Each structure stands twice: as structure tokens, then as C-alpha cells.
């Protein structure tokens, strides 16, 4: 374990702040400028559309009656805490995992604030093809997905030396 936070993955916590601020500013802009379900077409496959998500990814448990708000709050706090502990234990040089963890934490905290403040998550990025729409999402969701993808990628392409340095597999 690194001897100080400066030598640990916590040095990457600026990514958490960046994701969180970008996510919250974008959602505040949507709330200030859009009515619920209002949509503005930007490209032939992309709209800004304000929707409320009471569930999780892809509106999972969206209509569950309200208890899911507290479940997802606990999950966000739990994962953010766990990933922060892991960041403290790993060297700052493990850039892929440190970036992944901080993206997930920033996204989780962005959506957590929505749940606590509004009781729902503000989603607005709406991609579609003809009449088929992908579920709307936000910057926090994107950060969580990219972070999860990096964690999976890292598990396939990296091995660690005893000092924590990455070594390519194969």
C-alpha cells in the first residue's frame, strides 16, 4: 500500500470532481431550460429530451413505488466508499484502474445527489434510430459505463508486478 495519499490512486480524485461538476451543471441547465419530456432535435439520431428516471440504468425498477430511491442511494454510497478505499490502497501509476474508479465514483455521486435532491435522476441524452430510442441517460451514467468498461478492459490486459506496476498480458 502506498505510504501517503499522494502516492496512491487518491491523486486521481480530481476526475471525481470533474465528472460530478459537469454532470450537475448539465442537469441544472436541463432543469432550468426544459419542461418534462420536452425535446430538442440536435442531429438526425440525437435529441436533448428531459426525462425523470426513478430507477437505475435503463429505467430498471422505474415503477417500483419509491423504495428503490433508498436502495440506489445505499448502493451509490457503498460503491463510492469501497472504490475510494481501493484507490487509497493502490499506487497512483495504475492509471487505467484509478481513472475507472474515479469515473464510477463521480457518476455515482452525481446521480446520488439527484436522488436525494429530487427523488429521481435527470436524464436528457436521447440517442435513437428511426423510431427506436435508446433509454435516455446523462453524463454521470456515461462516466459509470466508461469506468466499468475500463475495469473490464484492465482485467483482460494487465497483470501487476509486486510493486504495483502494470505488465501487459501475453
From Swiss-Prot:
It catalyses: Release of signal peptides from bacterial membrane prolipoproteins. Hydrolyzes -Xaa-Yaa-Zaa-|-(S,diacylglyceryl)Cys-, in which Xaa is hydrophobic (preferably Leu), and Yaa (Ala or Ser) and Zaa (Gly or Ala) have small, neutral side chains. It is a multi-pass membrane protein. It comes from the Bacteria. It is found in: Cell inner membrane. Pathway: Protein modification; lipoprotein biosynthesis (signal peptide cleavage). One of its GO terms (molecular function) is aspartic-type endopeptidase activity. Keywords: Aspartyl protease, Cell inner membrane, Cell membrane, Hydrolase, Membrane, Protease, Transmembrane, Transmembrane helix. The chain crosses the membrane at residues 12-32, 67-87, 93-113, 133-153. GO terms for biological process: proteolysis. The active site is at residues 123, 141. Its main location: membrane. GO terms for cellular component: plasma membrane. Its EC number is 3.4.23.36. InterPro entries: Peptidase_A8 (IPR001872). Belongs to the peptidase A8 family. This protein specifically catalyzes the removal of signal peptides from prolipoproteins. This is Lipoprotein signal peptidase. It comes from Shewanella loihica (strain ATCC BAA-1088 / PV-4). The gene is lspA.
Amino acid at each position: 500500500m502506498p505510504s501517503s495519499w499522494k502516492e496512491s490512486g487518491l491523486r486521481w480524485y480530481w476526475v471525481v470532481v470533474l465528472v460530478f461538476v459537469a454532470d450537475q451543471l448539465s442537469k441544472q441547465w436541463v432543469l432550468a431550460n426544459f419542461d418534462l419530456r420536452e425535446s430538442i432535435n440536435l442531429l438526425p439520431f440525437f435529441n436533448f429530451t428531459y426525462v425523470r428516471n426513478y430507477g437505475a440504468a435503463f429505467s430498471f425498477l422505474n415503477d417500483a413505488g419509491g423504495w428503490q430511491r433508498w436502495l440506489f442511494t445505499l448502493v451509490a454510497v457503498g460503491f463510492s466508499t469501497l472504490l475510494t478505499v481501493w484507490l487509497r490502497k493502490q499506487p497512483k501509476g495504475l492509471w487505467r484502474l484509478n481513472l475507472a474508479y474515479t469515473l464510477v465514483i463521480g457518476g455515482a455521486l452525481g446521480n446520488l445527489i439527484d436522488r436525494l435532491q429530487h427523488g429521481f435522476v435527470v436524464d436528457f441524452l436521447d440517442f435513437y434510430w428511426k423510431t427506436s430510442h435508446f433509454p435516455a441517460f446523462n453524463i454521470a451514467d456515461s462516466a459509470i459505463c466508461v469506468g466499468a468498461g475500463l475495469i473490464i478492459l484492465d482485467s483482460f490486459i494487465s497483470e501487476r508486478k509486486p510493486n504495483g506496476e502494470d505488465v501487459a498480458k501475453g
